[in-house]
Amino acid sequence: MAEYLATCSFHSSFVKHFFPYVKSFPPFLPWPLQDPLFVVSLLRVDIVISICYHTQIYLHPADICLYCPFACNLMTKLHMLASRKMMYHQNVSCNEPGHRAGRVRKARSTLIVINSNTMERLPFTRNGSGQQSNKLRDPKKGRTHKPKPSEKHKKNKTGKKGAQEKTHRSRSSRKGN
């Protein structure tokens, strides 16, 4: 579940819809794990999500593990996923048309800390996440039906046909004379 959440870019309101006890930190706040109040409140929270726009946070995952020893393995996984995501994002943004050479957009990354004490009571399971992704990727919703010919279009066709019949009659009447 952590890998699924780490590879997705969630809006804070979307996350709070599934996790009512989530604490999200905007990117302009200082690094939250350096705050002792954050470490104390971590025991009362299932998942902590910090949306950040700077690569420096992920360069030293060992500093994170000092404050959260239970999340050591999880932090290593998230560090690898985040670095791959940032490299891909930077390569794509450099090659996009309309961008100046050397201009790299900052990647949006999500840090997730799962408390091991409450991990079994998470309201969001793998099955739930799979069903949600299937709903979002429903192929039927993206398809457009072919427009039916309108009655006005049909009248134009019959009108042309009627005009052709009239010209044919007038020619035959001239030949008869």
UniProtKB/Swiss-Prot annotation:
Residues 142-160, 168-177 have a biased composition (Basic residues). Residues 122-177 are annotated as: Disordered. It comes from the Eukaryota. Partially overlaps GID8. This is Putative uncharacterized protein YMR135W-A. It comes from Saccharomyces cerevisiae (strain ATCC 204508 / S288c) (Baker's yeast). The lineage of its organism: Eukaryota, Fungi, Dikarya, Ascomycota, Saccharomycotina.
